[in-house]
């Protein structure tokens, strides 16, 4: 079978390397490629992708757009974002990755979620499934945050530091930090947190600062990616536990 990841940009993705190594170790004759699709070309290119590939993963900024072209699962419908597709059906495995990556960790409230895109939707849905009720969303545009359609309080980005100061947990669902940028959160506000979670799967300044300041629980996106990838392979019907652990644990855990 043929798989790929679609996004823009997508050159930073470690998915092709990991999945192809997994296929090799498991003795599977599958391939996993990369398709960089600018937003303005999406409607044309997605039709080709659906014809050419058995399955694919969608990342920023395409998780919400994909919904229009696939038959979404119940979870994906509620989240309004798809990150895993198999033969015309769309799933959201991000939220599963969030829940599993937080096993054994108490998510203390209030919880601040930075961002209002596809990843934010999955994080909020996961938190609600875990019984978290007091969720505060901080986003650059208030209108986009309102469109989330979840029971959350909404704040603008210029309120981020004062909101974090009153919170116990912080989830960054944006790409801020991928290139070394920092969220506008003071050290004093960060220090008062119990949990810091960043969906970016390598160490961002937020994660480094939280560790240095002694935040009790600091979770990188690599754990979310690990469990999300496991779920993807199960959906595609090609999960092999031993090969998965050999390849994915080596890199991600």
Swiss-Prot record:
Catalyses which reaction(s): shikimate + NADP(+) = 3-dehydroshikimate + NADPH + H(+)
InterPro entries: Aminoacid_DH-like_N_sf, NAD(P)-bd_dom_sf, Shikimate_DH-bd_N, Shikimate_DH_fam, Shikm_DH/Glu-tRNA_Rdtase
UniProt EC number: 1.1.1.25
GO CC list: cytosol
Gene Ontology annotations of biological process type: amino acid biosynthetic process; aromatic amino acid family biosynthetic process; chorismate biosynthetic process; shikimate metabolic process
Keyword terms: Amino-acid biosynthesis, Aromatic amino acid biosynthesis, NADP, Oxidoreductase
Active site positions, chain numbering: 63 (proton acceptor)
Protein name: Shikimate dehydrogenase
UniProt source species: Thermotoga petrophila (strain ATCC BAA-488 / DSM 13995 / JCM 10881 / RKU-1)
Gene: aroE
């Amino acid at each position: 079978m043929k798989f790929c990841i679609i996004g823009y940009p997508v050159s930073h993705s470690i998915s092709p390397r990991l999945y192809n190594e997994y296929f090799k170790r498991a003795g599977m004759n599958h391939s996993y490629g990369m398709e960089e699709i600018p937003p303005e070309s999406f409607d044309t290119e997605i039709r080709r992708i659906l014809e050419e590939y058995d399955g694919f993963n969608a990342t920023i900024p395409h998780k919400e757009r994909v919904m229009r072209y696939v038959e979404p699962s119940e979870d994906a419908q509620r989240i309004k974002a798809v990150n895993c597709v198999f033969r015309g059906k769309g799933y959201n495995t991000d939220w599963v990755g969030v829940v599993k990556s937080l096993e054994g960790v108490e998510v203390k409230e209030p919880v601040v979620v930075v961002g209002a895109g596809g990843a934010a939707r999955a994080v909020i849905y996961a938190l609600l499934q875990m019984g978290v009720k007091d969720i505060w969303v901080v986003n650059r545009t208030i209108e986009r945050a309102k469109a989330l359609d979840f029971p959350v309080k909404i704040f603008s980005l210029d309120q981020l530091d004062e909101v974090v100061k009153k919170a116990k947990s912080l989830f960054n669902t944006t790409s801020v930090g991928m290139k070394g940028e920092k969220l506008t959160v003071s050290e004093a506000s960060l220090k008062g947190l119990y949990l810091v979670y960043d969906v970016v799967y390598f160490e961002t300044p937020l994660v480094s600062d939280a560790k240095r300041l002694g935040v009790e629980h600091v979770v990188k996106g690599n754990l979310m990616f690990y469990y999300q990838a496991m779920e993807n392979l199960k959906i595609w019907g090609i999960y092999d536990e031993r090969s998965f652990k050999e390849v994915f644990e080596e890199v991600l855990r």
